[in-house]
């Protein structure tokens, strides 16, 4: 072996390490410049690892044209069947162009192992195409692995009936004798939390404890919230007390649990303890406090926390924060204040915000603001029959049958049908 060849090999190895360092540390433009230099100046062929790193940086730096060029050179070098190059190509096309481009490439890859299948499944779930992800899983011609199930389970959470289907895939995962890991458990806790599956939450908690996953702070925070949604304050406190490092997520989860349980006093006390522990509250922590105030009708306290959120911590109030404040003010009959809050919103009020005001107006017989809220609500949700029914009931409760009848006719002309089981007889055909 000549000294020049040995020198070239040594230099190539050194530059590959440098390329890897750039790509893994997020210095993607530097990585791509180095790749172009290596590709143009070396007589020695670059290996699959170099191409996969270049594609990773193309995806991160959003460089689809260069990514296409690297793709062409990958094909020329016969690297398309390499799983690392294949996954990197899928990632690049999925992020820079579209999932359909990624699928087209996936169909062209000659040898697809589980890693490549999982990459395509993950692309579908990341862009919300869970149906396609499940169909692709069912079409797998290789043995699935933990990542296959994790991608599906994680993608299903938050979709319609997704929690139940996520649990079904968890059961399949167990049948395949795969061990759930932290990713699996985090998704499952979210799924169980959404449907109040208390027994399964305990099962997951027990499994995590036996397999030494339970100490992970993110999982513990998820368990606190999940137990809270099931109304099990005993388990909530048990998990929280076992946490050594309580970050803002953990504290927020505990506040949320108390709020859901209707214990506003404990929720506010927990918020104060969090501040004493020198943990800076975030927007979620304040939202949970406002929810606790709303459930308990603590309007003055809600106003204080709403102002502190912006004044003391410089946090921007979202639509959800405004909705909570409107809700608590409306609940205690402070309609004018609630309406002023809505008018001061920097963004367009949501149906939830107007609905909170309208519902409270009905309870208190406040017609003038009810009409304003209903008019705005019908603009936001013109096809929701519940909005017509609620305003109609308000009219009828104060003896304004003519307005109720006009509303019924407007509803009929608009093609909006009343929900089955509505108690408002005027709206029945």
Curated annotation (Swiss-Prot):
Gene3D superfamilies: Tetratricopeptide repeat domain. PROSITE patterns: PPR. Keywords: Repeat. Transmembrane segments: none annotated. PPR repeats lie at residues 11-45, 47-81, 82-112, 113-147, 148-180, 181-215, 216-246, 247-281, 282-312, 318-348. GO terms for molecular function: RNA binding. It holds the Pfam family PPR. Residues 353-428 are annotated as: Type E motif. GO terms for biological process: RNA modification. It comes from the Eukaryota. InterPro entries: E_motif (IPR046848), Pentatricopeptide_rpt (IPR002885), PPR_At4g14850-like_plant (IPR046960), TPR-like_helical_dom_sf (IPR011990). Belongs to the PPR family. PCMP-E subfamily. PANTHER family: PENTATRICOPEPTIDE REPEAT-CONTAINING PROTEIN (PTHR47926), TETRATRICOPEPTIDE-LIKE HELICAL DOMAIN SUPERFAMILY, DYW DOMAIN-CONTAINING PROTEIN (PTHR47926:SF426). This is Putative pentatricopeptide repeat-containing protein At1g03510. It comes from Arabidopsis thaliana (Mouse-ear cress). The gene is PCMP-E3.
């Amino acid at each position: 072996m000549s000294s020049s060849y040995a020198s070239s090999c040594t230099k190539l190895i050194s530059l590959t390490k440098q390329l890897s360092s750039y790509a893994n540390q997020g210095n993607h433009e530097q990585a791509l410049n180095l790749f172009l230099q290596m590709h143009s100046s070396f007589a020695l062929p670059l290996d699959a690892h170099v191409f996969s790193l270049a594609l990773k940086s193309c995806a991160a730096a959003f460089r689809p044209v260069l990514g296409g060029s690297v793709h062409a050179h990958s094909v020329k070098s016969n690297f398309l069947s390499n799983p690392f190059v294949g996954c990197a190509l899928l990632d690049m096309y999925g992020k820079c162009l579209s999932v359909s481009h990624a699928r087209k490439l996936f169909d062209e890859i000659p040898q697809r192992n589980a890693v490549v299948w999982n990459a395509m499944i993950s692309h579908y779930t990341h862009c919300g195409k869970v149906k396609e992800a499940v169909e692709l899983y069912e079409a797998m011609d290789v043995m699935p692995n933990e990542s296959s199930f994790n991608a599906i389970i994680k993608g299903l959470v938050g979709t319609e009936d997704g929690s139940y289907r996520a649990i079904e895939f968890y059961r399949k995962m167990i049948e395949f004798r795969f061990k759930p890991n932290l990713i699996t458990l985090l998704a499952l806790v979210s799924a169980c939390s959404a449907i109040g599956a208390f027994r399964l939450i305990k099962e997951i908690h027990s499994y995590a404890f036996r397999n030494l996953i339970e100490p992970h702070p993110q999982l513990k925070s998820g368990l606190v919230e999940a137990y809270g949604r099931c109304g099990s304050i005993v388990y909530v406190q048990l998990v929280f007390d076992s946490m050594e490092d309580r970050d803002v997520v953990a504290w927020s989860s505990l506040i949320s649990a108390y709020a859901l349980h209707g214990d506003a006093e404990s929720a506010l006390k927990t918020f104060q303890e969090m501040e004493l522990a020198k943990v800076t509250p975030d927007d979620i922590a304040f939202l949970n406090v406002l929810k606790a105030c709303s459930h308990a009708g603590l309007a003055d306290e809600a106003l204080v926390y709403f102002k502190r959120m912006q004044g003391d911590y410089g946090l921007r109030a979202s639509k959800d924060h405004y909705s909570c404040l409107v809700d608590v003010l409306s609940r205690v009959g402070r309609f004018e204040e609630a309406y002023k809050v809505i008018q001061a919103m920097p963004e367009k009020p949501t149906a939830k915000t107007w609905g909170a005001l309208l519902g409270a107006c009905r309870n208190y017989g406040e017609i003038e603001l009810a009409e304003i809220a209903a008019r705005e609500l019908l603009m936001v949700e013109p096809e929701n029959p519940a909005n017509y029914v609620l305003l109609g009931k308000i009219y009828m409760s104060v003896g304004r049958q003519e307005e109720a009848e006009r509303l019924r006719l407007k509803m009929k002309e608009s093609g909006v049908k009343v929900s089955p089981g509505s108690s408002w007889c005027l709206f029945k055909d």
